[in-house]
Amino acid sequence: MNINPNNIDLIISAVQEAQYPDTGLSEVALSGRSNVGKSSFINSMIGRKNMARTSQQPGKTQTLNFFNIDDQLIFVDVPGYGYAKVSKSQREKFGKMIEEYLTKRESLKLVIQLVDLRHNPTEDDVLMYNYLKHFDIPTLVICTKEDKIAKGKIQKHIKNIKEKLDLDPDDTIISYSSIQNTKQQQIWDLIANYL
């Protein structure tokens, strides 16, 4: 899959089903805990610096952000989970919005769950992965921040994450660095398999 970085647009930031765009394109949702590097991942995959806004402030994304990727697919940036400073009522509101999207959206073909390669998956990571599996949602696990781990230890960290998530044999796990950006084509090819 080849992407023209000059043909990428944020279509809408939605908070309810009535606002979801009707594009006829397959959708790939990006999920992960706050500050796992979702925005950096999106920007590096599409070859743009600031398409998805990165933030030092966790819990910043509070909407479903729909990006048209070169009229080939839609990336949907989902609010990060597991950020304690978001109020309980806000968390419940996000949870309902995300659940509605993940379980009812027919154009959703894949969820990319991002986890931090440096750490064990959090309880929220495990809950999210189990949730996706419960609803039979195809999932690609991408371990971010690969550049922060010594090359010789990457496979050990991946194995650990696989075990902690109890990864489904049908799901793929891959490590990635938004800074080094060396596996971009490999990930596009994996995504294309689901569209």
UniProtKB/Swiss-Prot annotation:
Keyword Nucleotide-binding (UniProt): yes
What domain of life? Answer: Bacteria
| GO MF | GTP binding; metal ion binding
Q: CDD domains attached here?
A: YihA_EngB (cd01876)
In which residues is Mg(2+) bound? Answer: S39, T61
Function (record text)? Necessary for normal cell division and for the maintenance of normal septation.
Q: Which family does it belong to?
A: Belongs to the TRAFAC class TrmE-Era-EngA-EngB-Septin-like GTPase superfamily. EngB GTPase family.
- What is the name of the protein in this document? Probable GTP-binding protein EngB
**What lineage does the source organism belong to?**
Bacteria, Bacillati, Bacillota, Bacilli, Bacillales
Q: Which gene holds the coding sequence for this protein?
A: engB
